[in-house]
C-alpha cells in the first residue's frame, strides 16, 4: 500500500506539476512564446510591485518610481513577501511581458482563484475583473476565469490585486497561457474529474443511506456522514467554476469538512474492525474539534484582519491548501 501511494504521488508530481511542466518560463518578467501552439504555465519570474495598484499606463510612465522584484507564483502566502513583521493583506501588481510570434493569433489565459479581487489588463486594456481591488471601494469575488485576446509581437499582462480577508493573498495558483481550445480543455478536464468524483460519492452516499435504513447498522450511517463531508470538501472546484464567491464562509467550510473527513474515517474504521478501544473515538473528537476551531478562527481572523491568526491558520491548513 505504501509503495502504491508513493507511486501515485510521484505520478502526480511528474505529470500534474505546473512548476515542472514542459515549456519555457519567463526570465526577468519576459516570456518568449514560440509559434507551436504549446501550453505555458506562468509560474516564475513575474515582475511584482508590492503595496501598490498600478495600471499599465502608470507602469509605463512611472516605473522607476516604484520598487519591484521578481517572484514565483505561490512563493509567498501573502502580500508581505515573507516578512512576518508586515501584514499579509494589502495590494500588489503582477506584470509579465510576452514576446509572441509575428503572425497574429488568439490566446487565452486561465486564472484560478486569485485572492480576493483583481483587474486584468492585456496590452494596456482592461480585459476583465473580479470584485473591486480599489482599497477604498473593496469588494471581494473569487472565481475561476478564462480571458481571451489576440496578439502578435509584444504583449503585456498586468494583474492588479487586493486582498483583505483570506488566509493566502494574491495569486497563489499558476496561470496558464495557450490557445483558447487548450486552455478550455485543461479547465474542462479538471472540472470533469471533479464532477465524476462528486457523482460517484453521491451515489455511494445514497447506497449508504439505503443500507442504513435496511440494516440499522451504525457503520453505514457513519459512512453516509463521511460521504457528506467528502461532498462538502470536494464541491469547491465545481462551485468556483460557475459562481463568484466571497472568502468566508466558503473557505472556512472547506477547512471544516476537511477535518471532519478524518474524524469520519477513524469512526468508520473502528466500527468495521470492531475494536473496543476508545482511542479512535478520542482522535475523531480531536479532529472534529480542530475543524470547528479552524472554521471559527478563519471567520474571526478574516473579519478582524489578524495577520498573526491567519499565519497560524495557514500553518495548520498547509497540507490542505497544497493538496
Identify the meaning behind each predicted range.
Residues 22, 77-85, 178-200:
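Non-catalytic, glycine-rich low-complexity segments
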Residues 1-102:
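Extended carbohydrate-recognition surfaces in non-catalytic/accessory domains of CAZymes
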Residues 91-97, 106-108, 144-146, 154-156:
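Intrinsic-disorder/low-complexity, polar/charged segments enriched in Ser/Thr/Lys/Arg/Asp/Glu/Gln
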Residues 195-323:
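Juxtamembrane segments at transmembrane-helix boundaries
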Residues 98-123, 157-159:
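Aromatic-lined ligand-binding clefts that engage carbohydrates, nucleic acids, or primary amines
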Residues 139-195:
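An acidic-aromatic loop/edge-strand motif
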Residues 63-74, 125-144:
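Solvent-exposed beta-strand/loop surfaces of large extracellular or lumenal domains
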